[in-house]
Amino acid sequence: MKKAFGQTVRDLKRGVNKKVLKVPGIEQKVLDATSNESWGPHGSLLADIAHASRNYHEYQITMGVLWKRLSDSGKNWRHVYKALTVLEYMVGHGSERVIEEVKEHAYQITTLSGFQYIDSSGKDQGSNVRKKAQSLVALVNDKERITEVREKAAANRDKYHNSMHRPSGGYGDKYDYEGRYGDRDEGRSSYGKEREYGYRDDDRNSRDGDRYSRDSEDRYGRDGNTDDEYRGRSRSVDNYNGSRGRSSDRERPIEDDGQSSSRDSGAPADDHSQDGRGGLERKFSEQNIGAAPPSYEEAVSESRSPVYSERDGGETPQVAPPGAAASPLAENISVDNKAADFVNESSPQQVEAFDEFDPRGSVSAACAPTAGASVPAPIPPTVVSTPAPPASINAEMDLLGSLSDVFSPNPLAIVTSDSTSVETNGQANTGLAPSFSTSQSSTQPFDDPFGDSPFKAITSADTETSQHQSFGVPFQPTPPTSNPNNEHNFGFGEAFSAVTDSEPGVQNMQAPPNLSVFPQEQFDTSQSEIDILAGILPPSGPPVSLSPQPDSTMPTSQFHPNGNSYESYHHQAAPTDLNMQGQTPFGQASQQFNMVSHSQNHHEGMQFNNGGFTQQPGYAGPATSQPPQYTPGVSSHPPSESFPHQPGSATSASSQTPYATTPNVSAGQFDGGSFMTQQPYGVTQQVHVVPSHIPQRTQSGPVAAFGNNNNIVGDMHQPGSTPSSSSQTPYPTTPNAPSGQFDGGNFMTQQPYGVIPQVHGVPSHIPQRTQSGPVAAHGNSNNVVGDMFSPAGLSSLETSASQPSLTPLTGAIEIVPQNQKKFEPKSTIWADTLSRGLVNFNISGPKTNPLADIGVDFEAINRKEKRLEKPTITQQQVTSTINMGKAMGSGTGLGRAGAGAMRPPTNSMVGSSMPTGMNVGGYGGMNQHQPIGMNQNHPMGMNQNLSMGMNQNYPMGMNQNYPMGMGMNMNMGGYGQGYPMQPQQGMGMAPPGAPQGMTGAYNPMMGQGGYNPQQQQPYGGGYR
């Protein structure tokens, strides 16, 4: 009686502990089966453990407990013996994976053959362990015996299945190819049905769910109708054919494991597909016969960026957008934009995306065909499998996630063609842009590494036609002939998406010169539905190739075929007009990076060490520039596209040229993808350094604000300059300039004379607008920082580089001196507390001093201590703040309590969350006149191309060639990346908390968000 009572108490105690400690159910069962009780493991526990071995996670828990039990010794010999018993049972009844693991641990089991333990009664209990260990090792080494044992176990299950204990659920056995246990639960009672459903559905999306779920419907399914009711779909949807192609002779119910396997698409049954989709999603899978099955991500996202996988150079199934039918290669394809409207974002098309970590292949989605199909006309989605040339750019996810396609937010309507001619008839209005037709031969969309597409820009020609003005005569550029052999993979997956062909003379794109003024309402229409992260997260779609200027000839884009992302890229053009825009490796006009003025005679050309390119035009003549037009299907948003907005109508044609005509410029040297000019005279510059993917609009007329919500930082610089159009020249007119040098991705002008530089440095992905006329206010709600610099009428950055006065900022953001906040160390707090009497250590003591008679005077001692303490406190207030204070840092090492307690510099700076890589007035990036603690040839600014995964040799921006991973907008750069590397730390160290993978307005000093001048640290030293 006492023994039974003690056993009951132990059981209760064990049960309470397991509940309190939240031990998993399977672990409880294994512990119970291998307990120290004097009886063997219960059959129901063994059955549950064997079934759980088919669940990956439960299998791991089970085996972990068993191997730990096998390591016991001495009086815990029952742990060892029972663990061997459980293993032996699992070899016959559980997953075959157990057999493999037992073989791997055979050495451990073999050592148990010498297990010794003699209990208090003198009985050799170790013999039981020795015999069991020997029998288990012999079993796992005998394949025939294993087969016999497993077949016998299967027969027993079929014979006694009515009395069989309910399994705890789990997945199918990937090793159980013969379907031996398929009939396990055919007539099982209803005990535990609902519980099993809930349990298994919780785990069906687990890590290896698809691997171990092949036979779950054979084992644990009961009734197809019950299954279908639970799944919420009818059996006719799956076209269930009643057999899985294995040894089962009856129809098995549909698994409730998140799978419809490969029955839908006709693929072999052994393809462990995870195709639990319905409706249109399944239709894509059914059409996708020869392709790898889509991933689970498709079941949860309806509109995701499409992606391709051309690793094997095989067939790439493609679904044309609902506004485009995939057709064979055509020589001349005429696309009526008004009819097709490129179906743009307005079509509620479901696009299955592809898991970037799923290695199984491509997904049928609406995306741009590779160099083997063209998409000309609107019909419902059609799957076309076209052999993708192995030489084409792999549209695989690179680590930085489709960098070049960050700014083509139209994932649905992508019109790429490898035909020799494409005519664009009409104009499809897409929210923010005029029509533009181009051929991007080797651009492919990318996957979205952050989940769903950041936005759905829903616009259509019906709603937008009344809001936009035409640019005049639509032009028909002659696209370059596609040559898939010249497509390159640049080191970052497809970081450079707009790759032009290396055939000379194929980009002679000419447009009619009669163009109207850049329409004001072109940017009035705000796409309020566009996410604020639209410029950060990479929606799929190739960036636009910019339209040529009127009467200009596109220079030949010659690309070195080695595919090196840092290879020099030369645009060598015949004498043409100066508005030359060629496709660059960054998917934008070559003018963006050709910061040095077009010269009539480049002596040494422009030298690019790092990912730059050289454009050597022969003659830079005046021309009335045209605002680049781009196709709505190719890209959607000017603020997120890469093209310079150039004024349509100009007072003076020559003054409106974005690149001043330079008679003789010796050399512009690009070292890190940045730009620096050396001007020997007093030239008033307005240098707009436009790194990758920055829309730059220079206009002389009144212009409305960018109306889209991508404009995070707003128009960074809106100087109210003089109305003369000569001030609109974004690049300086330099009669004779020595070589400009770029060191480490910064912009630095060395001006020997009185030059008033007006530098508007903008890192990647920031809209820049320089206007001389009145500027309309931003109409969007996502303009985080607003117009940082005042529009016309306010003194803007035009004089910020030459005078240290504060610049009035829109939104009442002003840089005000911060009061030096006194930091009080702990000793001061204690002294103050004690002096105020807030803490009385003599709470319970007597009022009179009991030791007064022996000469102990506590008051005198206290007074003496306070006198000694006060000088120390005063000294600590001066010197000891190096290691006290702020929560995250050690101060600056300069006797200051941290950056927040210092007065920021008086010259204008752009601020924390405004990632203007080349700030004005020498706060970071440009350091025109105040290169504090920095070499002028090595200004720290932002590596212009760094945000796109380029120029990784200079990630520090200091030209030290040490990629220390300081994350200066390396992570796909986005609006408000802030300064992950604080601008004027002499070391160029990154704050320790700047995550590399974080995009968005991250600032290591103040998190994500707006501008706070207190967070600047003007001194080199410690980082917060």
From Swiss-Prot:
This is Clathrin interactor EPSIN 3. Residues 152-161, 173-236, 246-255, 269-285 have a biased composition (Basic and acidic residues). InterPro entries: ENTH, ENTH_VHS. Binds to membranes enriched in phosphatidylinositol 4,5-bisphosphate (PtdIns(4,5)P2). May have a role in transport via clathrin-coated vesicles from the trans-Golgi network to endosomes. Stimulates clathrin assembly. A motif (Clathrin binding) lies at residues 403-407. The modification Phosphoserine is found at S273, S285. A motif (ALPHA-ADR binding) lies at residues 448-450. Residues 152-327, 419-492, 538-565, 602-670, 712-739, 884-910 are annotated as: Disordered. CDD domains: ENTH. It comes from Arabidopsis thaliana (Mouse-ear cress). Residues 18-150 form the ENTH domain. Gene3D superfamilies: 1.25.40.90. SUPFAM superfamilies: ENTH/VHS domain. PANTHER family: BNAC04G48710D PROTEIN, EPSIN/ENT-RELATED. Residues 419-432, 460-470, 551-565, 607-639, 648-667 have a biased composition (Polar residues). The keyword Phosphoprotein applies. One of its GO terms (biological process) is protein transport.
